């Protein structure tokens, strides 16, 4: 007996629908929903997608990286929007960091200066190396810190850019069409998440305690047969922007909030 990516259990040429659960997660203006197979004894209160089996360590690492990137994108979407600032901070030759320990110390000292003066601010920071220069730099997304204070409290080099997050973000879908995802900052989150290197060790990013967690709803039983061609109904006020069956055996759907739909 085998369960395919389409969710059907096949035995001796007969196909029947496997038991499935679905779960929605709300993060800012984005709602994601997964539909996944479970065994007949699965407790709906604690169910989650089965972790796939991997042929190699590389496959396992890729899967874990995708899960980590998805959680990071949800964190960004849950806490930041058009009032937030995205800043890139570089170090002058005088203060240049040469080791991971040095850039961590610089990041943490700057973090303390910001949080001391703006304790209610939301902050996420990552550090990385420039592709051409190999020099350390810091990226930050913040909400509740004036733009001039970011540069004033940095003082170790330049603020290359400090700009507000976009109200409209466009992504290319599977048909090559540009789709307005609104305040969905997954692309920015993936860019920042990709700065981490194995030599850095530890966590990929640092987030302030003021950041809120995405809201995960309890799982419910999927009583209908869903597919990317026949997705679950969008939450009120949301529009479907992405639908796909993953290589890991579950379906993934993304919806973004559209204020115009609330007027209907």
Regions found by a protein language model. Name each.
Residues 137:
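Calcium-binding loop positions in Ca2+-binding modules
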């Amino acid at each position: 007996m085998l369960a395919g990516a389409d969710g059907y259990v096949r035995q001796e040429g007969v196909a029947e629908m496997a038991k499935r659960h679905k779960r929605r997660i709300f993060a800012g203006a984005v709602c994601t929903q997964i539909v996944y197979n479970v065994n007949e004894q699965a407790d709906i209160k604690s169910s989650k997608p089965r972790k796939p089996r991997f042929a190699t360590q590389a496959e396992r690492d890729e899967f874990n990286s995708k899960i980590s990137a998805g959680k990071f994108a949800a964190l960004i979407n849950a806490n930041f929007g058009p009032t937030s600032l995205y800043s890139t901070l570089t170090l002058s030759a005088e203060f240049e960091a040469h080791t991971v320990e040095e850039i961590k110390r610089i990041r943490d000292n700057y973090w303390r200066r910001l949080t001391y003066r703006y304790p209610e601010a939301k902050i996420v920071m990552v550090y990385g190396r420039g592709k051409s220069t190999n020099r350390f730099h810091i990226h930050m997304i913040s909400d509740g810190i004036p733009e001039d204070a970011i540069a004033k409290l940095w003082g170790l080099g330049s603020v290359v850019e400090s700009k507000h997050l976009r109200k409209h973000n466009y992504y290319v879908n599977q048909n090559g069409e540009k789709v307005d995802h609104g305040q969905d900052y997954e692309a920015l989150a993936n860019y920042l998440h990709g700065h981490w290197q194995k030599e850095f060790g530890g966590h990929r990013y640092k987030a302030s305690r003021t950041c809120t967690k995405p809201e995960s709803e309890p799982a419910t039983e999927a009583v209908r047969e869903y597919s990317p061609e026949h997705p679950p109904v969008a939450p009120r006020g949301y529009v479907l922007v992405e639908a796909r069956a993953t290589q890991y055996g579950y379906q993934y759907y993304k919806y973004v909030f559209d204020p115009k739909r609330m007027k209907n």
